[in-house]
Amino acid sequence: MLTALVLFLSGCDKENKLSPTEDLGIVDMFSPDENADPRVKAMYNDYGVWVRTYFSSIDELTNSILAEDAIVAMRGAENLEEEKIPEVLNYSEALLSNVSKEYANSFFPLEFFYVKQYGALYWIYPVKALGRSRLILMWPNTTDGAIPVTDPVNHYYQDSVLTSEVWRKLGSMIVARMEEPLKEFVAGGKAYDDGEAYEKLGNEYDKDEEAWKEENPDADDEDEDEVNSRPYVIKYKNAVAELCRNGGYITGGSSRSFEGDFSEWLRLLVMESYENIKKDYLDNSKSRALKYEIITKYFKEYGWDIQAAGNKYRTEFDKYKASLPDGD
């Protein structure tokens, strides 16, 4: 009976509005109630995403559809501070406004759940995908490199580190909702090898580094420019770049799986201009140029001009960077 129920839930379309049962040990999930913030209701009605900002018990947060986080259930979490709610609504609205409603309703997680802290001590997760249905974000976010919130309305466009991490997580959650990988996209590059080629390059790098340091024992690893000029570093970077060009990947790690490959393409497309993508990724790789055409066409089938979103992001981010004092 349980196996049949799991299979049923796994195959449900997002728009079927799943309600987990007590028998599965999962807290019931509902849509926003009639007294919810109008902005929360609007995002739910338009995109099928419920922006949540409060939990009454840890199980309500750490138990999702067919997924639970036992570690944080033990370590604990803190509710979002009430005065931060407008900020997370701004962030959510900005993100969702860059996605077509059809695509979000078909593939996005059911919930964005914002908290002050998720986990404790060594088990803190600034951005956490809980299964394919709940994306948990700490706010203010402590992802390494994330910036303080100074302009809540435009923070989505200003904190590229946080936004990159969010889109990577969303990419994995989207893939989990697909019936199968995008066949044409996969065929456009080299077959995934579970990271074998990429890890081989890493192993060679370690050996080359060890040999170089034996010959240069007084080298200063704190000088970033000097480190990047070392022959073993240049060799490694060139080898990874070649792996990516030949395979149609954005990063070396993308060679592991469709999930990683799709997630990196998604993140790039929704945050970068066509001009920069063409210059940095397409002009030097036939495989990437082909995969670009296939994946952008795929998104357009759901009414999503993802490149337009990327063009906008680059424009807004550059505007923000230009406004900063020199040196920032």
Regions found by a protein language model. Give the residues of each.
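Auxiliary, metal-adjacent structural segments of Zn-dependent hydrolase domains
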Residues: 85-136
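C-terminal motif of bacterial Sec signal peptides marking the signal peptidase cleavage site
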Residues: 7-11
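Acidic/polar, low-complexity intrinsically disordered N-terminal segments immediately downstream
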Residues: 12-103, 284-328
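Metalloprotease/metallohydrolase-associated module, dominated by Zn2+-dependent proteases
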Residues: 195-328
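Soluble non-cytosolic domains of exported or imported proteins
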Residues: 79-87, 156-165, 253-257
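Lumenal/extracellular "mature" regions of secretory-pathway glycan-modifying transferases
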Residues: 124-133, 137-154
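Sec-dependent signal peptide recognition
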Residues: 1-2
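Active-site recognition of the HExxH zinc-binding catalytic motif
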Residues: 143-190
